Amino acid sequence: LANLEDKSSGSIKFNKDNIILGYMLQKDSLFPWLTILDNCLLGLEIKNIKTEDNISYVNHLLDSYGLAEFKNKYPSSLSGGMRQRVALIRTLAIHPDILLLDEPFSALDAMTRVALADDLYKMIKKEGKTVLMVTHDIAEAVSLSDIVIVLTKRPATLKSIYEIKFEERGTPFENRKKKEFSIYYDKIWRDLDVHI
């Protein structure tokens, strides 16, 4: 999906040609010798699109998501959740059409995971982005997603697709309290054939 390897077969179609992909790894992968602002601008530098407009956009994102006062600090001075927000801003900075998120919260404690899922949801809705996220956390998948795709064990093949519909969709934290949440959670749990 991220074009890191040659595809073996098939194709992926999106509304336009030459889509821009933003890829966020499990770990924040921030460079410790760069300030928060410089880490956020790195993708723009690599793609040679570090314009005044894009720098302004990054500063706007840092301000919007409570990180403006840390932009001249280094990653070591941030919490895990703050570092993940910086990684997400760095990914959004290049104006991707699609965000690929590989277990973006897996390294965080449970409370930070839920709080950051809410932040991610708000950012994605505000920025109007399409997201494809890999997660092993059923609650995270159900509370954040419009569609959940369940894969089989290795080699992974498509097992099931769930269209997640809440009577009234809220933030991931709010969605976890809704009756539909437990229904989807139970269905997906059974689908995964997890035995306790």
Short names for language-model regions:
Residues 41, 52-70, 122:
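Conserved ABC ATPase "signature" region
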Residues 113-127:
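Helical segment within the ABC ATPase nucleotide-binding domain
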